[in-house]
Swiss-Prot record:
Organism in which the protein naturally occurs: Mus musculus (Mouse)
Miscellaneous note of the record: This chain was isolated from a myeloma protein that binds inulin.
GO process annotations (BP): immunoglobulin mediated immune response
Domain Ig-like: 1-113
PROSITE patterns from the UniProt entry: IG_LIKE
Name of the featured protein: Ig heavy chain V-III region U61
Disulfide cross-links: 22-98
Length: 113
């Protein structure tokens, strides 16, 4: 059974920082690109960041709205992906999901700013 479990959400003040974590099980994590996606009433579903494989030197890509503020990383030995969020803004409020190539999704974690 595939599982993606996010944690680390919670209330944060504007300008603050937060780190989200997602632990995966049920598939070979190191073989999958991983993404963070967020959902809000105002913007709907919005892709946030992507991290590729070791063979791609863990290349990362970001939405323009978070570039320079958010950092995605992964630890294949722990089957985990992370999202460090700095200088948070009200518009960053949403439910944050980790996903593979959009085939598998976690349950989401709420980040109210």
């Amino acid at each position: 059974e595939v599982k993606l479990e996010e944690s680390g959400g919670g209330l944060v003040q504007p300008g603050g920082s937060m780190k989200l974590s997602c632990v995966a099980s049920g598939f070979t994590f190191s073989n999958y690109w991983m993404n963070w996606v967020r959902q809000s009433p105002e913007k709907g579903l919005e892709w946030v960041a992507e991290i590729r494989l070791k063979s791609h030197n863990y290349a990362t890509h970001y939405a323009e709205s978070v570039k320079g503020r958010f950092t995605i990383s992964r630890d294949d030995s722990k089957s985990s992906v992370y999202l460090q969020m700095n200088n948070l803004r009200a518009e960053d409020t949403g439910i944050y999901y980790c996903t593979t190539g959009f085939a598998y999704w976690g349950q989401g974690t709420l980040v109210p700013v």
